[in-house]
Amino acid sequence: MFPPRRLNVKYLRRLIWYVSSRLLVLCCVLGLMTMAFYFSMNATNVYIILKDGMAKRAQVVMMGAEEELTPYFSPAYLERDPQLVQARSGQSPYQAYYTITGFDHRISLDRFWCWPWEDTARATITERIPAIDGKIRPSAREAAAAAGMSTSAPKWQTTQYTVLLSRENGVWHIRNMTVVRLLDDQ
């Protein structure tokens, strides 16, 4: 004999709830995985932009190399970056007195946050250059001594920055950098 009709509806309702609850859990897990993927992708892209962009910036400041910085920085920020303005006006002590042949540039990403659906990101980074290879120019030896400069290149100030980045046409650019604090070299 067949069970009463009411019993069939009960089992059907249970089946629907079971399937729908599992689908909801599956959708939530897939959504979280998608968000984690995009967060990781943004974090990787931002780290590469910060690492390469800050290294090129230091190269321009120390070596006077006219590297193209627009792939990393917004043009508006390049016009108001104090170290770049000083270097481009010829007032950088690295360019005035020394011949810099290389340096060890390090960036540590202290904090980062960007929602996957936003086009702006904030990061806190620490920039340090523990070693600068270079020597004083023979023609600038007297001027450097008068300015109180040593024969070896001056140390780079280790600095912690808050960086604001924006994504334009799928490409991240550093839009603003604010000094959080100056750190002692360790």
What are the functions of these language-model segments?
Residues 100, 114, 154-156:
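Sterically constrained small-residue positions within well-ordered secondary structures
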